[in-house]
Amino acid sequence: MPVVRKIFRRRRGDSESEEDEQDSEEVRLKLEETREVQNLRKRPNGVSAVALLVGEKVQEETTLVDDPFQMKTGGMVDMKKLKERGKDKISEEEDLHLGTSFSAETNRRDEDADMMKYIETELKKRKGIVEHEEQKVKPKNAEDCLYELPENIRVSSAKKTEEMLSNQMLSGIPEVDLGIDAKIKNIISTEDAKARLLAEQQNKKKDSETSFVPTNMAVNYVQHNRFYHEELNAPIRRNKEEPKARPLRVGDTEKPEPERSPPNRKRPANEKATDDYHYEKFKKMNRRY
């Protein structure tokens, strides 16, 4: 009988372990790269120590702005520098960054700028560098006292600035996503509150209805109230005084009454009834009053 050899699989532990190590190294390198990119994108909190050590850079343009025509020091005036001194400012204003535009639109307050300003003013005070404008105090005349306002009339703008700062600080706080569970809870609580409010309103209506007071109280009020309204466009009628009797005198005689025509008397053709005429005249007289 031929001898049958059993075939056994050889272990490939070394090759698989090497592949796993390579994959783990690639993943680790990718993670490190992403972390470095995230760190570069992060905005540094507060004022950096390097910026404080370097201090404020004094540009050459400041000297030109202070004395462009060299009236104090003397010398030749460079007309090229005078013409080109405003170009850099325009280019800087045009290059608006995303952070500055976003903070301006959302009314966000830059705390670092305020901190730097405070540090600069405190350093100037300690070094004794005080601005000349603060030291200059104009002597007051007798007429200047007339233009001064008392303290009770002065409008203080401190309240407005405090409100503005509080709004800016609130807008600078980042929003935190609470998740779907919190939103669902809020929706459920609002629906429960609506149902409770509707139930309370229905109960109030049921309690208010009684057998003595009708439900259509407003309709009854309007129906009965119409009799108390005065007529606005009613014609104003004058009270006609009755004619006073004339006093009798000696020698007065009663006037003879006109002769009454018999009822069956024939009227002439030109004689017409005057009822319509007098009726129209009476209507016109009533319209006047």
Curated annotation (Swiss-Prot):
Modified residues (Phosphothreonine): T253
MF (Gene Ontology): U5 snRNA binding
GO BP annotations, alphabetical order: chromosome segregation; mRNA cis splicing, via spliceosome; mRNA splicing, via spliceosome; regulation of homologous chromosome segregation
Outcome of mutating R41A: Abolishes binding to SNRNP200
GO cellular component: chromosome, centromeric region; cytosol; nucleoplasm; nucleus; spliceosomal complex
Record-listed Phosphotyrosine modification sites: Y147
Subcellular location, record wording: Nucleus; Chromosome, Centromere
Function text: Plays a role in pre-mRNA splicing by promoting usage of the upstream 3'-splice site at alternative NAGNAG splice sites; these are sites featuring alternative acceptor motifs separated by only a few nucleotides. May also modulate exon inclusion events. Plays a role in spliceosomal remodeling by displacing WBP4 from SNRNP200 and may act to inhibit SNRNP200 helicase activity. Binds U5 snRNA. Required for proper chromosome segregation. Not required for splicing of shelterin components.
Family membership: Belongs to the TLS1 family.
Protein name, entry field: Splicing factor C9orf78
